[in-house]
């Protein structure tokens, strides 16, 4: 009898570990394998209980996409080169770094990316991703050859950072001598983002942040991770562009409606949105429209965030209320 009780206790102990949450904020930002939805409680699946909005945290498309997540049918090598026409210019510090093969390889780790919805939706997501990341890495200027929107991906890391971007954190402690300034296509910043991203993609970015600016596949993975991962109260960029995000009454009251403009709000709304006409927002739109034209897809409406209150202001008021 005692031996049976002991076996039961051992089984229960092991079961508690096997049932640990699998994804989302409960698992350090991890994504579900094979494009499965991450439920609001941190579990992976493909039914409505996992994928319904609001609640679903990432990859909320329902039925998982194909097993490879290969985007070569959505964006060709020649289109990639045309979009990022001057990335290898001698004036660009990132010349030779960002390659088509690195992008395609990295995207395979995120099966929902660029594979959700119909062909037009998939192309819009790729155009939106490169539109936003091109602004973050642009080397263009108003009179640049081929126009300012042909100079995305000119940089791979922040120039002359004024901070080491280290925020005190027990969960994501900064490594000695390391700085967490902007790196890669999305200019990933701060130790807590490096920590969560590293856990999700299987690389120790807390101790090796330079991997994001030294390894092009990891650079793209870090950018796509940011794109696919919601950070409450913000939805993921992915959920917005594929039409999975449904704004709440509070979102609508703040002017946040589905469209490319909300993605700008997610990425840098605290500095760029709700200020009327803004050159930075216009720059993001210019890249996106050019890429939509190359990929042959309509960019849709609601492209700016000029009159949107930022998600950051939502955080502020919630904190003040608490």
Swiss-Prot record:
SS bond partners: 23-38, 32-44, 37-51, 56-60, 92-154, 166-174, 273-305
All copies of domain Chitin-binding type-1, residue ranges: 21-62
Matching InterPro entries: Chitin-bd_1 (IPR001002), Chitin-binding_1_CS (IPR018371), Endochitinase-like_sf (IPR036861), Glyco_hydro_19 (IPR016283), Glyco_hydro_19_cat (IPR000726), Lysozyme-like_dom_sf (IPR023346)
Pfam family membership, one: Glyco_hydro_19
Entry EC number(s): 3.2.1.14
Name the UniProt record assigns to this protein: Endochitinase CH25
Disulfide bond in keyword set: yes
SUPFAM superfamilies (UniProt xref): Lysozyme-like, Plant lectins/antimicrobial peptides
Keywords, ordered alphabetically: Carbohydrate metabolism, Chitin degradation, Chitin-binding, Disulfide bond, Glycosidase, Hydrolase, Polysaccharide degradation, Signal
Family per similarity comment: Belongs to the glycosyl hydrolase 19 family. Chitinase class I subfamily.
Active site: 136 (proton donor)
SMART domains: ChtBD1 (SM00270)
Gene Ontology molecular functions: chitin binding; endochitinase activity
PANTHER family: BASIC ENDOCHITINASE B, CHITINASE-RELATED
Signal peptide start-end: 1-20
Stated induction or repression of this protein's expression: In roots by wounding and ethephon.
UniProt keyword annotation of Disulfide bond present: yes
Biological process annotations from GO: cell wall macromolecule catabolic process; chitin catabolic process; polysaccharide catabolic process
